[in-house]
């Protein structure tokens, strides 16, 4: 039986040393599922609410005891004897129980922990790996996603003068996920050598990428190209580049303030700036190229480079199907970043991915800068029509855990394992 016998939550630590919530669901047959909730550093203003205690005398106000109490009290009582195999019904019950648009009463962290743990428990009850169980919900063909490997950190993820938050390599020319992971790892180590040779720091940021104090943003791109060549790969063929501009972080009074470039640009000027980069470098993906409230700028960027480059809405869409529909209807961007904690339940996460697929938008399953050893997002990426995954660099166990899970899944699939590769960019095929 997949009816819920017990729900239990606790406060644990994430990769930045901040508290987060972990939930466990036990079923009547003794099957058990556990999930930990991630947390972001740069967050969209329309994200579901992560409930924090606010008590400055404890964990500097970042404790999650209230969210834990909500799980162990109201949620556990309401869902006792509920059939966890009814994922949609369970998530609807959680949403109704919270009763707010942004999940601010019980906390999106409380709802998400239970939602994901329930899926783990049902998979265990059916003696299936999570990705296989989820694929029965999504009715999707399974595939190994292209990893978007964040090897240089800037912005809110590092203490340096780099404005852009992430510089990524995408090994699209590899024949398998395991080969793609090897390529990324070799480039990562090559980059460390290049940075040392330039007398730059090899300290890493929140997501495991290096965080050197470059003189400008473009210097980061040039250094990555050098590292790709040194590792024996060809940029533009084997390896493409991706950016997370996270432009909401430096958007102020209608201008984009680039400290690294000593420039203050209008939306039109910043679109020109990004378009010039696309013309000069093998860039295939730009995330949050414009600020989340600059819809006119987004429209302009989409018209300018949207047929050549994947334009990913993160802060723009916050994994919210209602907001995402506005983007689809207006032809804004051509891809969506999927973060489970931005929306707060598994069902809504899967709904956003399905919406993207129907609209020929690409979807990228993503971690957060505050992560744990939880690997759920790896299984979600395989079991859905998402063709890419963002889960950080090639160091820090909270990032590598997801890559290792994907290696396990690839091995389990055997000859049936398919790597998305160049086919990952579905929005550029229309």
From Swiss-Prot:
SMART domains: Enolase_C (SM01192), Enolase_N (SM01193). Pathway: Carbohydrate degradation; glycolysis; pyruvate from D-glyceraldehyde 3-phosphate: step 4/5. InterPro entries: Enolase, Enolase-like_C_sf, Enolase-like_N, Enolase_C, Enolase_CS, Enolase_N. The keyword Chaperone does not apply. It is found in: Cytoplasm; Secreted; Cell surface. It catalyses: (2R)-2-phosphoglycerate = phosphoenolpyruvate + H2O. (2R)-2-phosphoglycerate binds at residues 165, 339, 368-369, 390. Keywords: Cytoplasm, Glycolysis, Lyase, Magnesium, Metal-binding, Secreted. One of its GO terms (biological process) is glycolytic process. Mg(2+) binds at residues 244, 287, 314. One of its GO terms (molecular function) is phosphopyruvate hydratase activity. Its EC number is 4.2.1.11. It is an enzyme of class 4 (lyase). The keyword Metal-binding applies. Its cofactor is Mg(2+). Binds a second Mg(2+) ion via substrate during catalysis. It comes from the Bacteria. Gene3D superfamilies: Enolase-like C-terminal domain, Enolase-like, N-terminal domain. PROSITE patterns: ENOLASE. One of its GO terms (cellular component) is extracellular region. Belongs to the enolase family. Component of the RNA degradosome, a multiprotein complex involved in RNA processing and mRNA degradation. Catalyzes the reversible conversion of 2-phosphoglycerate (2-PG) into phosphoenolpyruvate (PEP). It is essential for the degradation of carbohydrates via glycolysis. This is Enolase. The lineage of its organism: Bacteria, Pseudomonadati, Pseudomonadota, Gammaproteobacteria, Lysobacterales. The gene is eno.
């Amino acid at each position: 039986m997949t009816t819920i016998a017990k729900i239990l939550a606790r406060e644990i630590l994430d990769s930045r040393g901040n508290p987060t919530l972990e939930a466990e669901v036990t079923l009547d047959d003794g099957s058990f599922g556990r999930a930990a909730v991630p947390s972001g550093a740069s967050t969209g203003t329309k994200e579901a609410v992560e409930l924090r205690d606010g008590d400055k005398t404890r964990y500097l106000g970042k404790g999650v005891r209230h969210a834990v109490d909500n799980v162990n009290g109201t949620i556990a009582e309401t869902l006792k004897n509920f059939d966890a195999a009814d994922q949609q019904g369970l998530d609807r019950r959680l949403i109704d129980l919270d009763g707010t648009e942004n999940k601010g009463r019980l906390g999106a962290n409380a709802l998400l922990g239970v939602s994901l743990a329930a899926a783990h428990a049902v998979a265990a009850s059916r003696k299936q790996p999570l990705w296989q169980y989820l694929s029965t919900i999504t009715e999707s063909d399974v595939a190994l996603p292209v990893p978007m490997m964040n090897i240089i950190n800037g912005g809110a993820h590092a203490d340096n003068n780099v404005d852009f938050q992430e510089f990524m390599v995408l090994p699209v020319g590899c024949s398998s996920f395991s080969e793609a992971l090897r390529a990324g790892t070799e480039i990562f180590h090559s980059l460390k050598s290049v940075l040392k040779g330039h007398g730059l720091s090899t300290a890493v940021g929140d997501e495991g990428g290096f965080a050197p104090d470059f003189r400008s943003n473009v210097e980061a791109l040039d250094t990555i190209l050098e590292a790709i060549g040194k590792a024996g790969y060809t940029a533009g063929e084997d390896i493409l580049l991706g950016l997370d501009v996270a432009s909401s972080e430096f958007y102020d009074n209608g201008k984009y303030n680039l400290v690294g470039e000593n420039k203050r640009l209008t939306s039109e000027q910043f679109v020109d700036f990004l378009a010039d980069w696309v013309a000069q470098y093998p860039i295939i993906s730009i995330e949050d190229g414009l600020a989340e409230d600059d819809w006119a700028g987004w429209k302009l960027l989409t018209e300018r480079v949207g047929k050549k480059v994947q334009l990913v809405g993160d802060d723009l869409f916050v994994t919210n199907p209602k907001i995402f529909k506005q983007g689809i209807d207006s032809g804004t961007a051509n891809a969506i970043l999927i973060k489970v904690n931005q929306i707060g339940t598994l069902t809504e996460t899967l709904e956003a991915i399905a919406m993207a697929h129907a609209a020929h938008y690409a979807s990228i399953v993503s971690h957060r800068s505050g992560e744990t050893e939880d690997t759920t997002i790896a299984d979600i990426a395989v079991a859905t029509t998402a063709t890419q995954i963002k889960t950080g660099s090639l160091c820090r166990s909270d990032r590598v855990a997801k890559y290792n899970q994907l290696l396990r899944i690839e091995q389990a699939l055997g000859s049936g394992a398919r790597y998305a590769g160049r086919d990952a960019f579905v929005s550029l095929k229309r």
